[in-house]
Amino acid sequence: MTNNRVRVAVTGAAGQIGYALVFRIASGQMFGPNTEVELNLLELEPALPSLEGVAMELDDCAFPLLKRIVCTADLNKAMDGVNWALLVGSVPRKQGMERSDLLQINGGIFTKQGQAINDYASDDVRVFVVGNPCNTNCLIAMNHAKDVPSDRFYAMTTLDELRARTQLAKKAGVDITAVTQMTIWGNHSATQYPDFYNAKINGTSAARVINDQTWLKETFVSTVQQRGAAVIKARGSSSAASAANAIITGVNHLVTDTPAGESFSMCRRSKGEYGVDEGLIFSFPCRREHGELKVVENMEFNDFGRERFNITLNELRSERDTVKSLGLLD
């Protein structure tokens, strides 16, 4: 018995992440077994034949919850009436490309997407940005969707959090479910700070349970920060199935109240929490309570944690200043 319907836009839908994602949305894994799904799938014009193949496969799965598929290269059509916009597609950094080049190219893309969301999406739209650099892409899209409340924009550090939980569980020799309150602070980049001091293993600080400061500060932190690059080196292309899984998990966190004693990492617009500049898209520890998303307060930092926190904060400030200088922000 279904009692709900959600229309979801997925950009870059024929790409590797999109291909790993859309079947799981259609099966009910993102919004649950009582929510019907309509998919608006966006691709570049040359990729439309491939996208039609994805739509054929979706049809061939005969998902009971999937009620409609739209395949298009028209951004406005893709965003028409959507309740969720999953912005997966972006231009990857290529050899010889400066970070400012990457920000400028993607800035143009996310400017247009923000405008289309503003003009065509449902009044209750929520926006989940995956395409990198996702924090600043989210900031740009948010800036160009003036009619959409800024607290409905998110960027993903869910994959980083899941990577960190796994590394701690393996090192401690415990089940993955024993690891809770694992926070990724800051930017979804190699400066992110996976906070092992405030993470818990069976309710005790992970730093006390593992009790190997060298491993935690050096191996653990760098493994989480560099995991994406390690996957590329190992398989020849970037994380796709794990990224899609993280999108499912991340959106599920945003639509389901958080269990007691748990939190999750999510990039959202700062209101000044923990001294972060208001307006930056920054990854915080979050909880959803009675349908409202809140930043977990009163987490403490030692000198190591504060140093790492400031490094990632400064990188996000730099990205913001760069895109502002490029005319991508008001």
Curated annotation (Swiss-Prot):
Alphabetical keyword list: NAD, Oxidoreductase, Tricarboxylic acid cycle
Record: residues binding NAD(+): 12-18, 106, 113, 130-132
UniProt binding sites for substrate: 93, 99, 132, 163
Active-site residues (renumbered): 188
GO biological process: malate metabolic process; tricarboxylic acid cycle
Keyword Lipoprotein annotated: no
UniProt cross-references to Gene3D superfamilies, sorted A to Z: Lactate dehydrogenase/glycoside hydrolase, family 4, C-terminal (3.90.110.10), NAD(P)-binding Rossmann-like Domain (3.40.50.720)
NCBIfam families assigned: MalateDH-SF1, PRK05442.1
PANTHER family in the record: MALATE DEHYDROGENASE
Protein name (database record): Malate dehydrogenase
Organism: Legionella pneumophila (strain Lens)
